[in-house]
Amino acid sequence: MLRNAGTKVLFRAITLVALVLSGPVFAYSAEDATNVTSVVMAAVKDNKLTIAADNGVFTDTAPGIPKKLTVEYRIGDEKLKREVNEGGKLEIVVPDGQKLVVIKAVYGPADGSTPQQNDASIAPMEVLETLPGFTIEHVLKSERTKGVSWISMTKDPKGRLLLGAQRGQPITRVTLENGKVVKDETMSIPVTETMGMLFVDNVLYLNGADADGKYCLFRCKDTKGDDSYGDVESLREWRGGAGEHGAHAIVLGPDKMLYIVCGNFVDVPNDLAPTSPHRSYGDDLALKRAEDGNGFGAGRQPPGGFIARVDLDGKNAELYSAGERNTYDIAFNSDGELFGWDSDMEWDWGNPWYRPVHVFHSVRGGDNGFREGSAKWPEYYADSLPQTTTIGIGCPTGVVFGTGAKFPAKYQKAFYICDWTYGRLMAVHLSPKGASYTGTFENFVAPKSLHAKAGKTPLNLTDVVIGDDGALYFTIGGRGTAASLFRVTYTGTEPAAPIPASQLQENEGRSARDLRHKLESLNVNHDPSTVAFAWPYLNNSDRYIRYAARMAIERNPVAEWKEKALAEMQPHAAFTSLLALARLGAPETQPAIMKSLSSFPLDTLTEEQMLEQLRVIEVSTLRSPAVVP
């Protein structure tokens, strides 16, 4: 009882420190926002409040700036406050016998900024900054009076850009010559909320909603030959999640399969192929999960956000990897490796389980450790994989590798990631590290107002592509905000001819990546030869190799490798194989697991090995709770 009370005090103290340090991020200014108390009070019906945080409901006093609704209210003697970002919905239900009283409601800039003073579309180089030798141009502004706000982008076989929109708005197609718009047209494809778009040859794939609000993977063909792509077929429905926490980007893999990243509210497809590599997942946390205090994601079980792999007909689905939160976009580098840019849960700031926004390497069968509420895994859990590059805070949206850009070689190899909240387009520079990568990052494009005393310049980036002209194009928009298309070119003195993708490949780490791929290829079917091949790699110093070897071994019946695991005396190999046994073995195996672990005194182990040993104990007691009291 005292321990629980102390924990609560500690968590509150940590949260308070975080709020103090973060300063204006959580604040709003009364002068810059609109008092909407009367509107919110009028929305209370039958002692219940349901209201959308939307520019259509409230006056938009800060065009182009993301906003939030803040409501202070009282239930009985308790004074409370709730916040919801623009585009969301606030619901407050009061227990029987108590009354809801709205004290104050404010709708205004989410980060406490002043209303828009600078429009990046007018003179981008005056209010935006980029690296030496690069130039930013404004290309096109949306018709905001019609509510068009661009949230995704792709390139068709003719090099035209397709700009996807939100809230019932259509797709815009833009034809460019020398970076100038010569034609922009509205397409009549009956799909909106297009958060994923991809051309494969002359076929357009979309993730979005149809006229009935059903979220699906669509295939659009130009069967009439009139450039309309009006032959629309639903290949797969995405259940559970929709929109911003739904199915997002679609990319074509080196294997000519579609890789589709889904947010944490999408249900795992119920038709997974037997070859599906990500299996046997759970919360697997010793402390009972504390759900989010506002109920966001409460009750949703692992695997969290995931990447699905399907064929070009949307069939033969596999759960390729998981344990992300709400990744919006993914991309393959020139080595054929898949990377994503995952979000945080900003309401967790200050709590021990907070996970910052980060770049991750998605490998076959990988688990990146996201769970809902307080159940998020620390990076050291051996049954997960670590972050590649930790960024900090932000709102991840579109990504692209610089392959094909007319940039210096360093920036052709870079991984470009969009931050919607802080208006940053960052360049991540990845370097091989064993069978994976590590990385550093820098701001490639950002508002000068991020560090200068000036009026805020909204630059809520949504997506990014490399055009056929070698320029980088990015869009801003989302949640009804003003949308624009920008172009970045290199005008410096360094060589900038596009380098073929094959010449951008990394020789460093190639043998380790090849070994990892070989082990991953064994995580498909039962093969009696797999255990003998993979076993030596359980003791590899590379965590990615050990992970792939364990997953390959787990594909085979426990009876084929149980005794080897219990007899293993090399620490890494023992703990990795015993982790597999803890995950998949029968409960009665647990005493033997504990006995094997006792063969490794703590003073003989490295810190990493001690954590691996602890993880085996944790998973074993969680999955066989009746054996150890």
Model-derived regions: residue spans:
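Long, ordered, helix-rich scaffold segments
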Residues: 477, 490-629
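Bacterial N-terminal signal peptides
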Residues: 12-24
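Beta-propeller domains with acidic blade repeats across secreted/periplasmic ectodomains
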Residues: 114-521
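Hydrophobic/aromatic-rich, well-ordered segments within soluble, folded domains that form packed cores
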Residues: 62-80, 134-144, 543-555
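N-terminal secretory signal peptides that target proteins for export/translocation
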Residues: 1-9
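Extracellular, modular beta-sheet/disulfide-rich ectodomains of secreted and cell-surface proteins
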Residues: 24-113
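Short amphipathic alpha-helical segments with coiled-coil-like heptad repeat character
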Residues: 75-85, 143-152, 336, 407, ...
